[in-house]
């Protein structure tokens, strides 16, 4: 969802988000800045295109929800994209079962090496995680933070094929939506379901600045349960 017409000031999303619950702090700080900077230690801090991805897949418990507050979007390019990865996974389950089963069964290693904080983080998890009832629990997919495949050599070709196919579908026009954030917009989404990205932008043509916030899924579910009563 996109909340429109919020104040265009730094940290002004806090009053909106605090009506739901408290935000989740990470090493990125809160809010984190999505802006082009010199000598970046993360691709989000560049002007490069970002493929659709989940944030922080190397965490054991990645944030459940993310909120991106647009302050300025005056550069050429920098359009946003999003894809419902549950829909893509459901398509594979119904039409390409072998690929789906591989994505469910074979864990991937996600990693982050942050030399500015002297921290190396990693976590193993499958691209598609199911509940005990077979429903979709979450999707972990971020090409930029995937480590080398760690599986049996006999499975290597099958695993590469499955993830290549999944990655292509996550950018297929049948599933993807594209839009442009305007100043004052807050793009809110389920980080474990809706993968997000952006097109390349030209920092010489204008400024682009978003502020990001995370919130745990438990906080959202708890608030929804309360409002239902």
Stretches found by the model and what they are:
Residues 1-229:
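Active-site environment of non-heme Fe oxygenases that use a 2-His-1-carboxylate facial triad
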